[in-house]
Amino acid sequence: MDEEEHLHRFGTPLPALQKDVVPAKKPVAIEDQIVKDENGKRRFHGAFTGGFSAGFWNTVGSLEGWTPQTFKSSRGERASSKAQLKPEDFMDQEDLGEFGIAPQGIRTRDEFANEDEQKQRSDQRRRKLMQPELGVGAIPGLPVLEQLLRPVRDKVAVRILKSMGWKPGQGVGPRQTRKEKRQATARNSKEQYLMEHYGAEGLPSNKENKGEEDSNNEDEDDEDITFAPDDYEPIFYTPKENRFGMSYSGLNRDPILSKSSSSSAKPMQHINLFGEMEAQANKKQLSIRGQAFGVGAFEEEDEDIYARDDMTRYDFSLADKKPKQKKQQHVQQRHVIDGFSEDNSPAVLQRPYAIDLPRDFQPRNWLQRRSRFAPMDKERAQKLETASEYKRSGLGRHDLNPDQRAQILGEQQQEEKTAEEQPKRNPFKDHSKSLMERINARTEGFTKGGVITENGEEQQTELAKEVKEANAAIQERAALKTKDLPSAMNSSSAFKPFIADEAKQLRYEKFVSSKLTDDKEITEFLARMQPVTLSLWDREMEKKEFIQAAKIYRPLVGLMNDRFVSEANVQAEKVEQQEKPPEERKIVMERTKTMWKPTALLCKRYNIAEPFGGAMLEPEKELKAKAKISVFDYLETSVNTKANFETPSIFPKHIEKSIPEKVETPPSPPPAPQPEAEIQDKPNTKEEPSKHTFVPKTPLEQAVDESRNKPISEKVDLFKSIFEDSDEEETELSEQDKLAILQESFGLPVTSTTSAAAQNVLRNTSPPRGIFASLFSPKIKDAAKEPAPTKFGPIEGSKLKIAYKPRKERLRNDRELAMAEVAPEDIYGPKLPTAPPQKPAAPEIQAEANIDDRLQQLWQQHAPKKRKAEKWVEKKCISGSEDSDASSSNESSSSDSSDDNDKRSKLSKPKKSHKGSSSKKSKKSKLKSKKKSKKSEESKHKAKKKKKKSKH
Amino acid sequence: MPEFENFNVKTTIDCKQGAVRAVRYNVDGTYCLSCGSDKKIKLWNPASGLLLKTYGGHADEVTDAAGSCDSSYIVSASLDKSIIYWDVSTGAPVRRLRSHAGGVRCVCFNEDSSIAISGGRDNAVMCWDIRTRRLDPVQVMKEARDCITTVATNENRIYAASLDGCVRTYDIRVGELTCDKIGEPITYLAQTRDEQCLVAGCQDSVVRLLDCETGGLLSEYRGHRGDDYHIECGILSNDAQIVTGSSDGDAFVYDLLDGKVLQRIRISDNGGVVHSLATHPKRQEMLFARRRDMYVFSTDLQIEEEQL
């Protein structure tokens, strides 16, 4: 019993276990715990805890099942544009909720958001843009321009400041005079110093007035020059809330690396390197972005294991407050906009500040910005109008009479006499001028800058603004005065355009009532009224103004009269117009008849026989030839054709003329017998040569002309000259030339008429190699048997018709010839090489040839006897009876493709296998054929090059 | 010669299809078509004013329409550059013919409705084979140098009036194109029943009667006002009177021979241009289009009384 009394019990005891009963209530296993949303639906699905419920229980169906979408014709609603579906339309309610994919909440607008938030958002936007379906532009991916250019947008606060006249770099506050400013800077620097050395709770600064004295004597006259205050970091004096010693802050309760330590106004403690990163991490935690994986709903968030030990990790009391707090915080945070945190400081009763607004203040939403190209709002347009009017007329200063000027200058009401005696001058101008000069003299780098006014427009100068303001003030005053005046001096004129100037207005009213129209009379009339002080120019201007004003500010009746016309008048006018007899134009009928061919089908449909039995000439043959009529046909409708600008006789042929024309149609007999169809086909080509007769023809052209009318079989020569591999003849030719040059240089007579045999002697005697080997050798052998008809065979010297020389060579030859004529003494400079040395080249070729020969010999030696039968490998050896035809035809085309060669080799393969050759041999043969094909390719390239050259 | 009887209004139909661009009778005059600026064609019974069918499918204003000889098809021209061949009974477009490079202004059938002829703003006259399913024109005549305003045809000729002031006659039988130059832009062209003459409404507020054979100018009819409107004219079935619309809301009936105004039909007191008209192929009856309305005028008093 005693013991029981001494025991202290905490909590409620568990029910005593009954002996037989095993505890039935098992804790629910984690996997069996299900999170449900407010509708009782399961919130997370999938294999892992983190998943989303998409659609209807993760299906595409509904409670009734899935039905495929039925076809709905959009025909009826073609015009109505479909409402753009947003992703939100496909989301569930919970997706839009706090924990969904697209949480919706209150956010600060971009204009007000702080910088990193803005950046984050723009990043998001960019990410969106990067998605292919959203990238609308032609260039996929990030828009480059957006990357390069970033709109300059100040924060609203900055904008407001700017509109108040603040400029970046300046401080905020009332403008200071020079003296004041100096004091301020001194004070600031001192404070700064104190701040650095003693912290925020440093000693209060003593006022030192030493510096003032020297400045005082410098200048006292420039009181009216004001400067913007300097920008400095203001010092916030925080009230002391604790009872620690001076500048002692105790142990920081926050985690060391947390953000709050850096953001709190304790300067000397800790530099947080990870501030930004941490802040971002925090944000992430705050806004659950719907990541599928991570911390489960039932799991406690892991502790920050990398955080260093600090005091927060220790309990200071037995009660475990922490989780509670956390929950509370979380609940609170839900209603806080991203990037903000709730203020925990106790609410301080703040005295409401009554702001007395300027009288002409007009609230305006700064965010409703208009396009630059949108029409101006009426008010502003008017404002501008008046302002510019003022400027345009250049009369700003003339509008002021001496009284007003006196008012502006702050002079006391002077006697009229003195006012009149004063010379006319613009007080503003002079004053301002001197002011500007003084400012310029004082300050270096003072640049005239615009001031952003309330409307966001930059006023040219402050002066203009001041003048305007002053004027407005005067006008206001004047208006006030006139208000008291007995109204209806002149009842007829409701408008008082010159109300600002009473005298002027009076004059105007008189002028209006006089109803003068003559210019002279008006001047005289006005002269009587105008004060003597008014200059001639002013008088003139006033007259003009009056006339203009009288025009504008007319009584309503007149205005209406001008705008509207009575119906009777209109009718009368119309009748008059009608009555006016329209000028009689003699209509002369003209009839022209032309041939026109209706199409056969049209005739058929009209059940009419085709005119002339369908044998009519068709003028629109080319139109018919086109399969489809394209829009471009109409680009050259009859209006645009050349024929239309000429006499109509050209336009479809006249019947009368067409008959003789027909007789004429067969043109002068063609140079060669030709089928009739060809005549009609090529009328243009025939005409052309006659047109361009003056152009000297190249031999090739001549050949083309000659052979134009020949049958194809006879055109072989032409083709040869065009397409043949001009390698051989060129080499021949060059050699011939070289010889000639050599002979010339040796002083021998040039033997131009050398026989073929003689030339052959001069030729390179080395055996043909590579592709030429295959080209030449059979030719030489078969020369006797089949003389000419090869299409692209080499041309023998005597046969040569068209010799092509590369331009370079020709030029060189010419030059050399020219040089040869001139005596060597007359020429200076290094001598040009007359001809490439032949001798060194020859052995090379020879050597190559030798190598080839030797290779062949080797090949033949090493090859087994059987292989000797395989003559197909080297073309040179082809003389076989079976292949002769094919080979000759193949060889005849000098630029045979390598493919063909390959084919041939393939074709011949079976033969070889038939003969029982080993795979080794076939390999070798393949290699050979490859080599050959390579060579042939080379030759092909060469040929191509030649062709190009010849074309040029 | 029978005496001229005045025309009286028989029916007034509010077509409810925007401005009525053209009114046309069918082949025997029992029905009529109105082409609206709302891109639809409406088939009416002119006697009762009953709307029979609406044909919609054009993409722009319908400028002209014509019924086939058996009244089972309609061909219509539109500013959407296409011609549509409609089935009358189903109201469905059978074929859409596109080759014109500009809006099509006029269309007509030949006598047995095997060929449709159209003229457009692209200065081209196109002949379309209706029998086959060919979608390109059988023949294109591009001689005109300005917009084709009317095409007409008879057994062996195709007439095309153009704003270049010429009436072009394509004689299929002879294989000849005859160009009669008047010199004034022609806004409309009508044939007399005997096919001897053409009635050409000109831009200078004159209707001219042309002789087909010689190409001579037979007569001129003045009195109405054309201004710059596309005013149509017509000839009554007895070939004795010529009708024309006017820009001042009237219609004029001229005597063919002496060119006098027989009747100035006051269609409406509210003005509006009477720009389109159609004459009944058999009776003394006419259709007029003014603004949104279609008017049926007839000399037949009895019907009028019945109506009243």
Curated annotation (Swiss-Prot), chain A:
GO terms for cellular component: catalytic step 2 spliceosome; nucleus; precatalytic spliceosome. Residues 323-333, 906-934, 941-952 have a biased composition (Basic residues). Residues 107-123, 375-402, 414-432, 679-691 have a biased composition (Basic and acidic residues). Residues 886-896 have a biased composition (Low complexity). Residues 214-233 have a biased composition (Acidic residues). Residues 153-199 form the G-patch domain. GO terms for molecular function: RNA binding. GO terms for biological process: mRNA splicing, via spliceosome. Coiled coil: none annotated. This is G patch domain-containing protein 1 homolog.
